Amino acid sequence: MRRAAKVDANQAEIVQALRKIGAVVQSLAAVGNGCPDLLVGYRNRLFLLELKDGNKPPSAQALTPHQVEWHRVWQGHVVVVNSVESAIAAINNPA
């Protein structure tokens, strides 16, 4: 049996803030295997966001080996964010 998906402590706050500015947000946390945490639709664009808890030390915010591999093989853009501000910046100022 698969265990429950791990959700970062700041996910609810980030999701709420993104929805407040008009984004559509779908949690992908249950997918696992390194898949990013959120799929975000905003201003006719899609974003994949990997959430990290900005209150933890940098070493605890590192990508897991599964996340590193998922990001490596994905042929699209994935943004790692650790706060409401960085999540909003990621969708307002895409790379």
Residue locations for each model-derived region?
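Catalytic phosphate/metal-binding cores of nucleic-acid and nucleotide-processing enzymes, i.e., regions
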Residues: 1-95
